[in-house]
Amino acid sequence: MTALSNIRNFSIIAHIDHGKSTLADRFIQTCGALQDREMQAQVLDSMDIERERGITIKAQSVTLYYDHPNGERYQLNFIDTPGHVDFSYEVSRSLAACEGALLVVDAAQGVEAQSVANCYTAVDLGLEVLPVLNKIDLPQVEPERVIQEIEDIIGIEADDAPRVSAKSGLGVDELLEALVERIPAPTGDRDAPLQALIIDSWFDNYLGVVSLVRVRQGSLSKGDKILIKSTMDSHLVTSIGVFTPKPLETGKLEAGEVGFVIAGIKDIHGAPVGDTMTHAKTPDVDLIPGFKQITPQVYAGLFPVDSSDFEKFREALQKLQINDSALFFEPDTSDALGFGFRCGFLGMLHMEIIQERLEREYNLDLITTAPSVIYEIKKKNGEILLIDNPSRLPDPGFVEEFREPIARCHILVPQDYLGNVMTLCMERRGTQVDMRFMGKQVQLIFDIPLGEVVMDFFDRLKSVSRGFASLDYEFDRYEVDKLVKVDVLINGDKVDALAMICHQEQARYRGGQLVEKMKELIPRQMFDVAIQAAIGSQIIARSTVKAMRKDVLAKCYGGDVSRKKKLLSKQKEGKKRMKQVGSVEIPQEAFLAVLQVDNQ
């Protein structure tokens, strides 16, 4: 077993594309954990989607043995963290398991908001943060400017920051030496009762739930009976070890170490991320602080195109949920779309990934309704409701207050694009909280309704700032506002899946835009199709998809006008009858038109 003083637990904090996974690959290669023939790019990103999108979704860990030039052998436990704003809770759990973090910054691009947010989390948790300049071999690097930015924005010394190129391996040996010297060794009593933090859990078809844990106090061996604090369920440990990145059984983990535990747990909710694990014989061990149940922020309806796929869809969601405790779903029915599920996600990226995995891994064809957030409704009798689906809103007559969730947004933007970004935030009904100039960058803090943020705010922010602005947001509070529900009627019938909640001042504009958009997307029928947007019983916008008609007068050459009138009125009668019985097929694009209303 490695002595406590020779263990280093660390994480890498980096913005998307700043080279975190590549640096991890270099560490693995330098320490000889995998043979060269087994190396592939982004070793730790195991899902195809992770590789394709170049993002890390689940936390992974790897234990490396590093021989220091001073002759000592060190055990380095690297815990990989997701970088995207949707997965910030997983980041905080990964960081809580470490004593230090490497802040990897692209030496050409500089500091981004996400790294700042995660870096603050690390500092709050008391971690030693070691800044690293990556991509130093690129021609356009500006290390002096970036060092100044790190000092101005994050407030940590960066003069002696190691300069590396993860791609070519330049400076990686020096970085490993600095890591061992700068990051403190873990503390912990190996004879105390067991206290271990669950960093991540995932499901294996043969082994059940595999938990990645960091042992804080005590030790854990194969054959021990363990207890999960939040569920108070006990399980028998069947396998225990470390990832090197391949699983390697060690039979024991001691204080300060990071590894995996398999105890035949059948359900991912049986080992929630952030929970505390202990021995069944010492159930009153203190909880490790910071554990919270994950709550979805964004809800959307998912419906199979072919209703016979419903059971297959349910199974697919259950399988995904086994591996993703943040995914929530419940059965939902829609008059327009039939049977499906109302699903809750952490954010828009999470939603896209789940949808893509359902379609790719389970061959499902799905229709997605526009996403919405949770609103708080206070009824006149004092009852408070939480509404995640616009079609479930009570009648406006019973509602006393309509409260919407507000997100606190931290935006970092170069000064040149400040005006565009502020205009965008104002358009989204944002209120400015703070603004600080830091070198060439400006840090903005805005309070913006969460419903506006989750729609397409991130994409719009990137486009108005040419990709330079970066965003981090978290839910802050509920606030009363004048909100209304806009219904869409097609030929007088409400289509529940198209309903949306928006601000009273924007309702006419958004209703009008939606109706126009629908007009382009609904194919022409043999009869007129009226598309209307309404608030309650008041119609606020209307548009008509004109009928296709056959030229019934083609065979009348000349002849009496009454003959023509007769043929036309006969056609008119037929269309009228058809309209009474005809139903309109609504294509998938039309359901997503709600999303594109703001993109004009």
Curated annotation (Swiss-Prot):
Entry GO terms, CC: plasma membrane
One of the protein's GO biological processes: positive regulation of translation
Domain of life: Bacteria
Enzyme class: hydrolase
Gene3D superfamilies: 3.30.70.240, Elongation factor 4, C-terminal domain (3.30.70.2570), Elongation Factor G (Translational Gtpase), domain 3 (3.30.70.870), P-loop containing nucleotide triphosphate hydrolases (3.40.50.300), Translation factors (2.40.30.10)
Keyword terms, alphabetized: Cell inner membrane, Cell membrane, GTP-binding, Hydrolase, Membrane, Nucleotide-binding, Protein biosynthesis
Record SMART domains: EFG_C (SM00838)
Catalytic reaction annotation: GTP + H2O = GDP + phosphate + H(+)
Listed InterPro entries: EF-4, EFG_III/V, EFG_V-like, EFTu-like_2, G_TR_CS, LepA_C_sf, LepA_CTD, LepA_IV
Residues at which GTP binds: 17-22, 134-137
Keyword Protein biosynthesis among record annotations: yes
Main location per the UniProt record: membrane
Membrane topology per record: Peripheral membrane protein
EC number of the protein: 3.6.5.n1
Protein location: Cell inner membrane
Annotated GO MF terms: GTP binding; GTPase activity; guanosine tetraphosphate binding; ribosome binding; translation elongation factor activity
Limits of the tr-type G domain: 5-187
Family: Belongs to the TRAFAC class translation factor GTPase superfamily. Classic translation factor GTPase family. LepA subfamily.
Task of the protein: Required for accurate and efficient protein synthesis under certain stress conditions. May act as a fidelity factor of the translation reaction, by catalyzing a one-codon backward translocation of tRNAs on improperly translocated ribosomes. Back-translocation proceeds from a post-translocation (POST) complex to a pre-translocation (PRE) complex, thus giving elongation factor G a second chance to translocate the tRNAs correctly. Binds to ribosomes in a GTP-dependent manner.
Name of the protein in its database record: Elongation factor 4
Organism annotation: Psychrobacter sp. (strain PRwf-1)
Lineage: Bacteria, Pseudomonadati, Pseudomonadota, Gammaproteobacteria, Moraxellales
